[in-house]
Regions:
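Radical SAM/AdoMet-radical enzyme domain recognition
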Residues: 56-69, 78-169, 176-178
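Canonical Radical SAM [4Fe-4S] cluster-binding loop centered on the CxxxCxxC motif
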Residues: 3-50
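Flexible mid-to-C-terminal extensions adjoining Fe-S/redox cofactors in radical SAM and related proteins
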Residues: 1-16, 249-302
Length: 302
């Protein structure tokens, strides 16, 4: 690539982003679910109260402010979901909690929390009630929550009209941000190999919000993935993303897990030791995670 610097327009490296799978249970069975595929025999588990308390205490000791994304599985159906929100939102370094939900559950009775946001995921082949999905979004927006909808760009051509219709419906909802979400292949290291007719059908997405800066030019995910603007191998990446699994193990997102795993029950000072974001050298030929595409990356002079 001709560029020397890449990042999200609002990216701040002086905090950490934590992704937490407090359970590996979901009402849906999406064929492309990377979490279900990667967890294998660990799918169908719920974090124990001991693990949850250990994770919360480790975040309580964090030196840097943190954002927490609750994933899974489907986080809202977990028996400790509200307990987690109660505890996390009272921590000193807490900034935001992002709940990633398929909105299969009725959320209209959800209690209020400050600095809580919802990332609604629309799965076109699996969503059982699109009307309930939309009603949940409208309800949470009406209560003042920040909301964004991740619309999964399924490769099945028969689903494309439904995807386009959902995008158009969401466009008509004031205050709702829309994020077309691309699918992974067999692992999160590889994007699904979309056909030419997919890119042609969804070409209108090129005009959507552009929030990824490549030097002084702005692009969106559609353009970046279509034009393969994802090779940052050898660049310095200010990766501040960490993921916690259902067993309380934490790794730096995107690095291999073999030599990179720490259990937070045994080491509650893990986040305390992270005092600033130290850049890592990107080892990959393609960055296919929309979250990591937001991180500051700087080309190193050869």
């Amino acid at each position: 690539m001709k560029y020397s610097r890449q990042h999200h327009i609002q990216q701040d490296p002086d905090h950490i982003n934590v992704h937490w799978d407090s359970l590996t249970i979901c009402q849906l069975h999406c064929s492309y679910c990377y979490a279900r595929n990667e967890y294998g025999k660990e799918w169908g588990k719920i974090s124990s109260k001991e693990i949850i308390d250990g994770v919360i205490e480790s975040l309580n000791r964090s030196s840097l402010p943190f954002n927490l994304g609750l994933l899974g599985g489907e986080p809202t159906i977990g028996p400790h979901y509200y307990y987690i929100l109660d505890k996390i939102t009272k921590l000193e370094k807490f900034k935001w909690v992002y709940v990633v939900t398929n909105a299969e559950k009725d959320l209209t009775t959800h209690p209020h929390y400050d600095n809580l946001a919802f990332l609604f995921s629309y799965h076109p082949a699996d969503c059982t009630d699109p009307e309930r999905f939309i009603n949940n979004i409208k309800h949470m927006l009406g209560r003042g929550y920040k909301c964004k909808v991740n619309i999964m760009l399924h490769h099945d051509k028969k689903l494309w009209p439904n995807i386009k219709a959902m995008i158009e419906t969401c466009q008509g909802i004031k205050g709702l941000r829309i994020h077309p979400h691309f699918l992974y292949g067999n692992t999160i290291q590889k994007l699904f190999n979309y056909r030419k007719d997919f890119w042609e059908y969804f070409a209108f997405l090129e005009d959507y919000e552009k929030d990824l800066a490549y030097d002084d030019e702005l692009f969106n995910d559609f353009q970046v993935f279509r034009d393969k603007m994802t090779d940052f191998q050898g660049w310095s990446c200010y990766n501040n993303n960490y993921e916690i699994d259902v067993r309380g193990n934490v790794v730096k997102f995107c690095l291999g897990k073999e030599d990179n795993v720490v259990n937070l029950l045994r080491d509650k000072n893990f986040f305390n030791r992270i005092e600033k974001t130290i850049p890592m050298i990107c080892p990959h030929k393609a960055c296919n995670c929309d979250g990591l595409l937001k991180q500051l990356k700087v080309r190193n002079d050869s």
